[in-house]
């Protein structure tokens, strides 16, 4: 099985909260696609709550589009990581890590402005596979933690696992 890009970086050295360009690629017509690792918490040290990350999934996707989409950027998808330490965001375009970090922080401010759980988008059995597994309070706790910590940048060159280490794993 091929080694995926996300497993060639040292998770023990990742800062969080932090944004990282996980991958650059191009469509056959030349459009740039960028995948970002939006690391909310340090791998193997902390984990996002099940209900909190699910509620963030519903809120974050819309808020990030509000703050980042424009003439040169269009978000394709924002999905939670299976390890529950963050989200992957795929988009058309090449915004800077700082632009993404600023949009992320603005989105967290938006999460704090949601007053009631009933305001969570697609919170019903028709549009959500686990519509009862939500917590606005937990999502807002996560947002407060991100705002308080600020968002830094993780660079692939700083996190790259050596061929020697990869060979031993």
From Swiss-Prot:
GO terms for molecular function: iron ion binding; S-ribosylhomocysteine lyase activity. It is an enzyme of class 4 (lyase). Binds 1 Fe cation per subunit. Its EC number is 4.4.1.21. Its cofactor is Fe cation. Fe cation binds at residues 54, 58, 128. It comes from the Bacteria. Keywords: Autoinducer synthesis, Iron, Lyase, Metal-binding, Quorum sensing. NCBIfam families: PRK02260.1-2. Involved in the synthesis of autoinducer 2 (AI-2) which is secreted by bacteria and is used to communicate both the cell density and the metabolic potential of the environment. The regulation of gene expression in response to changes in cell density is called quorum sensing. Catalyzes the transformation of S-ribosylhomocysteine (RHC) to homocysteine (HC) and 4,5-dihydroxy-2,3-pentadione (DPD). This is S-ribosylhomocysteine lyase. The lineage of its organism: Bacteria, Pseudomonadati, Pseudomonadota, Gammaproteobacteria, Alteromonadales. The gene is luxS.
